[in-house]
Amino acid sequence: AEKTAQACEEAEKATKCARQGTGKTGDKHNCAFRKGKDGKEEPEKEKCCDGSFLVNKKFALMVYDFVSLLAF
């Protein structure tokens, strides 16, 4: 996931970024360009984003659950 994020950050155009995820057949795209959110810096600027933070968040929750089971 880190390599994908790095490649996505290096992409300069939307087509280049979209191609990062097309190498895998039957899988979703790894990254995409989207506009920033309100309250963030430069909300109108398109930025290359990927979903790897969701994987990291899910992994952190799994580790937390596992550690809480060890407490019993």
From Swiss-Prot:
InterPro entries for the chain: Variant_surf_glycoprt_trypan_C
Membrane topology: Lipid-anchor; GPI-anchor
GO cellular component, one term: plasma membrane
Propeptide: 51-72
Presence of keyword Cell membrane: yes
Keywords: Cell membrane, Glycoprotein, GPI-anchor, Lipoprotein, Membrane, Trypanosomiasis
Superkingdom of this protein's organism: Eukaryota
Keyword set includes Metal-binding: no
Lipidation (GPI-anchor amidated aspartate): 50
Subcellular location per the Swiss-Prot or TrEMBL entry: Cell membrane
Function: VSG forms a coat on the surface of the parasite. The trypanosome evades the immune response of the host by expressing a series of antigenically distinct VSGs from an estimated 1000 VSG genes.
Protein name: Variant surface glycoprotein MITAT 1.1000BC
Organism of this sequence: Trypanosoma brucei brucei
Source taxonomy: Eukaryota, Discoba, Euglenozoa, Kinetoplastea, Metakinetoplastina
